[in-house]
């Protein structure tokens, strides 16, 4: 599911969102994509109830606003829904905490995305490959 955030309400931003949804549909025809306005909570919740994945690609819940979330209706969470987050600070967002409390079994935080962005940035800045396995051991150590 892809949801449109009103932070950047330009035609270019909207076009980009729709193009990404179309590209995803072409790459994975069996994957249904839905673009909806985050301000329409009824549509958002109905869409989540029909989805296999909920991925927050906004900054809602990121420090210093850790107590914010896009989801205020806990009934949309279910055990088999996969909940993912691109935010890595805080490590566990309110959305992730709420999903866990509601019984969601598969919850993924944003540290993996941060790691792989770092891999690409390292290569861009140094021209060398980052020692990913070494960094993973340090980065994901509890």
Task: Give names to the regions the model predicted.
Residues 1-49, 53:
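Glycine-rich phosphate/diphosphate-binding loop of Rossmann-like nucleotide-binding domains
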Residues 7-8, 62, 115:
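Surface-exposed, flexible loop/turn segments at secondary-structure boundaries
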Residues 8, 65-74, 137-142:
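Short, surface-exposed, charge-dense and proline/glycine-enriched linear segments
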Residues 10-13, 17, 64, 92, ...:
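Alpha-helix N-cap/helix-start motif
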Residues 30-107:
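Rossmann-like adenosine-cofactor binding region
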Residues 82, 86-142:
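Adenosine-phosphate binding glycine-rich loop
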């Amino acid at each position: 599911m892809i949801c449109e955030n009103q932070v950047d309400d330009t035609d270019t931003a909207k076009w980009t969102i729709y193009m990404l949804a179309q590209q995803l549909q072409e790459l994975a025809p069996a994957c249904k994509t839905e673009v909806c306005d985050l301000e329409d909570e009824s549509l958002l919740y109905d869409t989540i109830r029909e989805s296999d994945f909920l991925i927050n690609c906004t900054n809602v819940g990121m420090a210093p606003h850790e107590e914010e979330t896009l989801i205020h209706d806990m009934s949309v969470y279910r055990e088999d829904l996969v909940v993912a987050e691109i935010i890595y600070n805080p490590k566990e967002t309110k959305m992730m905490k709420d999903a866990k409390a509601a019984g969601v079994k598969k919850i993924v935080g944003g540290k993996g995305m941060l790691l792989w962005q770092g891999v690409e940035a390292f290569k861009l800045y140094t021209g060398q490959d980052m020692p990913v396995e070494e960094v993973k051991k340090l980065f994901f150590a509890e």
